[in-house]
Amino acid sequence: MTDKLSELRQTINQLDDEILALVRRRMVLAADVIAAKNGGAAYRPGREAEVMARLVASAPDLPAGLVVNLWRQLMTASTALQSDSMTIAVHRDAMAVAGWHFGGFFTTIGCDDLASVRQAMADGADIALLPAGCEAGMAGWLLGEEGLHVIARTPPVGSSTLLPVWMIGRQPADPVTEECTLVARQGTNGPELEVVSGRLDGAAGGGARVIGVIASNGKTD
């Protein structure tokens, strides 16, 4: 091994130690935030989306997926500090994204189909994950479920290996700057979902229901 290569590796090792120290400091601060929130919502998908969008924009020389992957794990670990008892009902086609998004910190319930996901939520699961392609079924379900809301679409950037997934929770997503509104209605051929740019306040009208206002998806790698 040349002296130059040895020096470079030593520098990388030092950087790794510094990164780890910063991660530990971040976790301490996350615990302080939890104490200051005094019982507020543990999971804030809007806040996460805005943080990731800011970080991706501040590092245009890095792949967006790299930034999102790193902070996804940090944010999930921080959420688990406040509440590690969340239960996630996961459609079988969303299992890969569930593992990526929640990192194994929470209990997951594998579900074969939409009906199984609905039952798991009826039985008390906190969050449900449905893959893209289930929009009609999701719209029909949430039209009659005032207590459930779409709170996110994940991953927040395009991925060649992970299919996009809808996330459903029991509280509306926290507001962010860049948003889109999801409206469910009965169409000519059955339930359908409309995605509207921005925030639509108030009732959708015509038997429709706003089933979620979520962060707009950001940059694609």
Question: Residues of each region from the PLM?
Answer:
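Domain-level signature for soluble enzymes in the chorismate/prephenate branch of the shikimate pathway
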Residues: 1-221
